Curated annotation (Swiss-Prot):
One of its GO terms (biological process) is protein folding. Disulfide bonds: none annotated. One of its GO terms (cellular component) is cytoplasm. Belongs to the SecB family. It is found in: Cytoplasm. This is Protein-export protein SecB. Keywords: Chaperone, Cytoplasm, Protein transport, Translocation, Transport.
């Protein structure tokens, strides 16, 4: 009975998944198509969340893919994949993990598909991004925050 009450309090639901922003640039085409294809792929990930209402949150996953070929930019693709989630009655640490890792895990396949589609429409070889471990990224973020806090110099007491 107590477990049922706890599960009822810690509800989670996806309200909506949406594409917030998208950009595709191929600054060196069509010249890029005449070169041997040996790409150097750089992926940047970022997440952001904000509360929309009581227990309702918007989470944005930003992916930026920059592909260079022979030191020239072949293409740059930026996607902001958004989601609106209900996350009620969670402890602060659980909510932070939910918004910083669990929700981005849900959004990533949608963003990955959008990037793949844009790359193919640009007539470049298909780009399949490997899955991201948002749990590990979130833990790394927490460790960095903790070490920054520990390294921050203590403020000198104000003199009277």
């Amino acid at each position: 009975m107590a477990e049922a009450a706890q599960q009822e309090q810690q509800n989670f639901a996806i309200q909506r998944i949406f594409l917030k922003d998208v950009s595709f640039e191929a600054p060196n085409s069509p010249n890029m198509f005449q070169k041997e294809w040996n790409p150097d792929v750089k992926l940047d990930l970022d997440t952001q969340s904000r509360e929309l209402g009581e227990g309702v949150y918007e989470v944005i996953l930003r992916l930026t893919v920059t592909v260079k070929n022979e030191e020239e930019t072949a293409f740059l693709c930026e996607v902001q994949q958004g989601g609106i989630f209900t996350a009620g009655q969670m402890e602060e640490a659980q909510l932070a993990h939910c918004l910083g890792a669990f929700c981005p895990n849900i959004l990533f396949p949608y963003a990955r598909e959008t990037i793949s589609s844009l790359v193919v429409k640009g007539t470049f070889p298909q780009l399949n991004l490997a899955p991201a471990n948002f749990d590990a990224l979130f833990m790394n973020y927490l460790q960095n925050q903790a070490s920054e806090t520990a390294e921050a110099p203590a403020e000198a007491p104000a003199e009277a």
